[in-house]
Amino acid sequence: MSSHPIQVFSEIGKLKKVMLHRPGKELENLLPDYLERLLFDDIPFLEDAQKEHDAFAQALRDEGIEVLYLEQLAAESLTSPEIRDQFIEEYLDEANIRDRQTKVAIRELLHGIKDNQELVEKTMAGIQKVELPEIPDEAKDLTDLVESDYPFAIDPMPNLYFTRDPFATIGNAVSLNHMFADTRNRETLYGKYIFKYHPIYGGKVDLVYNREEDTRIEGGDELVLSKDVLAVGISQRTDAASIEKLLVNIFKKNVGFKKVLAFEFANNRKFMHLDTVFTMVDYDKFTIHPEIEGDLHVYSVTYENEKLKIVEEKGDLAELLAQNLGVEKVHLIRCGGGNIVAAAREQWNDGSNTLTIAPGVVVVYDRNTVTNKILEEYGLRLIKIRGSELVRGRGGPRCMSMPFEREEV
């Protein structure tokens, strides 16, 4: 096994190390009037969400998996006063604060926080206007007056517990993503500092995509099927131009992959990422949401003579996967058993969003009873977790985890 700090050459190899984010005060800054702006449909109850998340983390530890936390890694990356100051300035610049006085007040507030992890968690939680000195009306600009009812000086980042999306581990490399929405793109700042300054990861990991790019890609659309084959989704959150940039970098940097299967499917919120409708659970088994199958287009992408070669695949999906994975047959396990009502309900509650921690061993929400029963009938071992509050953010076990190390398969 390589000593490289990032080692992810499959979706199913035994998981050794994973990064999570424990939901924090950012969830308490969700308001009904601004849910759409922050990409939420409902407001989780923080206390119960934390209990559910702690149980998820413990279930992973019980399987011998080392659990890292985004907030701790980011804090450990602020290794000098200069780097800490730089982090605060970048955070302020990306918060799009229009008023100079407000920016000065927030800078003072953040510099007043001496503990690095407390600082990181405060940047995640957002900053309410009531936390700052009040600006007299005569000193306010037009934007301040028009948006006087908006409660935040800096928006919270409530999606952070979905650590799968801001960056993705691919082989020994990382795709540091440019995300679909401004409210989530700020999340990638933490990954930037981890992979630039962290004592273990800083400067030791190649980037195959950079957050400075102007086209969008998210980790839920990046799946590592084997040491030779990747799958990427062309979705609501990831566009084809980003995928082409990613693939050119992967092939040029010799990260180790020979082919990419690009999945184009319905562009809407309920199917926001490939991993909300399609995940690998064993050497020869995948979960899939049946609603995407009719409109699914798959393209094979290779790199020849220093350019991408793209071929649309016309055959059966299971046969295509079997051929590319070198197995005799692939089983597609349909969410909800293919029943239109059960499939729609359980996909919405992330029945297709499984986290595989070893071949045939998956973490799932306990609430998706129809899909879970079928998975067990296929011989999989299920580690069931509660997700009544966590699921309100529209993400499951895979969404909530970013593997840093897997065993080879």
Swiss-Prot record:
One of its GO terms (cellular component) is cytoplasm. It is found in: Cytoplasm. Pathway: Amino-acid degradation; L-arginine degradation via ADI pathway; carbamoyl phosphate from L-arginine: step 1/2. It comes from the Bacteria. InterPro entries: Arg_deiminase. Keywords: Arginine metabolism, Cytoplasm, Hydrolase. Belongs to the arginine deiminase family. This is Arginine deiminase. It comes from Streptococcus pneumoniae (strain CGSP14). The gene is arcA.
